[in-house]
Amino acid sequence: MDEFLNTLDALGLTENTIVVLTSDNGPVLDDGYKDRAVELVGEHRPAGPLRGWKTTMYDGGVRIPFMLRWPAVVKPQVSDAFVCQMDLLASFAKLLGVTYPDKLDSRSTLKAFLGKSKKGREALVIEGMFNYAYRKGDWALIPPYRNHPHCLLYNLKEDIGQQHNVAEKYPDKVKELTDEFEALKESTGKKTKF
């Protein structure tokens, strides 16, 4: 990355070039490769305080780093805006004045990407391998799947590590989020029920 950024500097392109650095999923250690990752990780926690890893619907598997650099426009800052990689399409299309099919899942969160708003998406369906999660505001809902027969609900504002399932404590919130999730899924033609 350093070489790439230095090349932009050398070519005089830094100020007007958008650079995005992100990942496709959270960390993974025990993935079947004989790389000794589990033994070598020691006390290090690759996902920090987040629970889970790649292939899980916990934030450790789906909350990923996202850095955007555009020196002429975006001032250095940290943001907690809720954004998603698929929103790059709609956001860059808006930035460039380009139209795109409105049936896509991409939504413009351009103001958040440019540091002009602390608010991004309101909600997001996250799909993994045979499992889903639904995020809305401070809430994360993980519907039942495979070996998990019960719905999981987490208040991320109070429990970023997703250690305390509060589904039984907030049945109305579970119903609200489940109904929204099912409606969104149905609108895409997905037949999977939980």
Model regions and ranges:
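Structural scaffold positions in well-ordered secondary structure
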Residues: 1, 19-21, 65, 88, ...
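Surface-exposed helix-capping loop/turn segments at secondary-structure junctions
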Residues: 3-16, 94-103, 182-194
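Intrinsically disordered, low-complexity polar regions and short flexible loop motifs
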Residues: 159
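C-terminal cap/loop subdomain of S1 sulfatases and analogous C-terminal strand-loop tails that border
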Residues: 27-57, 69, 73-156, 187-191
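Extracytoplasmic/secreted proteins, especially bacterial periplasmic and envelope-associated proteins
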Residues: 3, 12, 45, 87, ...
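Loop/turn elements at helix/coil->beta-strand transitions in domains of secreted/extracellular proteins
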Residues: 13-19, 120-122, 136-139, 173
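A structural motif
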Residues: 59-64
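Metal-dependent active-site segment of extracytoplasmic phospho-/sulfohydrolases and closely related
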Residues: 1-34
